[in-house]
Amino acid sequence: MIVGGEVRSDDAYVDIQKVVRDTVNRIGYNKAEYRFDGNSCGVMSTLHEQSADINRGVDRKSKGEEDLADIQGAGDQGMMFGYACRDTEDYMPLTLYLSHIALRVLARIRREKNSRMPYLRPDAKSQFTVEYDGETGKPVRIHTIVISTQHDEFTSDDFFMQSKIRKDVKEILIPEMLKKIPESEAALFKGEYDEESNPEGYILHVNPTGKFVIGGPHGDTGLTGRKIIVDTYGGKGAHGGGAFSGKDPSKVDRSAAYAARYIAKNLVAAGVADELLVQVSYAIGVARPVSIFVNSYGTASCDKNGEKISDAAIAGKIGELFDLRPAKIIEKFGLKNPIYEPTAAYGHVGRKPYKAEVELVRGGVRTKKEVQFFGWELLDAVDQVREAFSL
């Protein structure tokens, strides 16, 4: 494991070796037969101090009565996007929502005592294809399911191995999935496809290459920055190209993308539109965004005069309602708290917000603090938005 990057801190000490090894083991890479495990893997740290040239635009000192939020500039230039739609209760695209549910259930089955699928290893991927009605835009059925899951070496032949895993996915994983989702979404699963008896059923692909024994960090070199669509909206909306993980909140790649999701979700929940893409862009060292762009895909509501609200009008209201300076984003969502580990799997957006107690260490002193996780998923601006748009 190579831990690299630039950091700036006056008094922090982190036991990199322990953090890495504990995390790898907790994920599930804890057996020598995986050819990579937390107990025996090498850990190399190349962390070094952040460039002073970058830091000078982010960590400026006040020179009088200036607003401190105006002094802290964006940590980089770029475009960030937030998206929301009415596919699910979480205002997320259905395809990505189902993909995350499938992997969560698969991981739970793997960790069960006396697991029903005891051959499972930690690495896994999923992909769902949904057929939509061309006129209403509503989902009609699940078209294709792809599940690729790492597994132990079987002593029998490959055909038996493939058949066994496929049978378990169909009879264990998918039924467990259906228990986790609303009835309206479960109804889209219309059984497995058969050309004659069930042409409306889903096509199921399980480990399409036929074998998946070598996986995880032994099979692939890292994921950070290489799966940015899985981290966000699964291909819906848009992405500015900047990965989230591995960045502190001064980097607007992360913090502004969270803020844009918060805005899009609250506007859709308030009824401004059924689908909304929010784009913000920044210049390094400059606090306020240089632009705000909105695409409602023709789904915007009508104002009190019966006229459809324009995307330009929505963008203008966003600029009035939400403070998008990095310091204010960080303050609103508590982004300096240790809240990021859960974002490393199952996506950064579309998650359930919750509060939990964490341990903080400063100057060798340990303290407990309750912090908000996934605060950008809260729907606490809906009333404010409805009032602003007279809805």
Enumerate the predicted regions with their spans.
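Conserved mixed alpha/beta catalytic, RNA-binding, or beta-rich assembly cores of soluble enzyme
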Residues: 174, 221-274
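Short, conserved charged micro-motifs
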Residues: 10-16, 91, 153-165, 300-313
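Glycine-rich, mobile lid/loop segments that gate access to catalytic sites or pores
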Residues: 25-29, 34-214, 345, 350, ...
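ATP-dependent carboxylate activation and anion-phosphoryl transfer catalytic cores
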Residues: 148-155, 201, 208-215, 220-223, ...
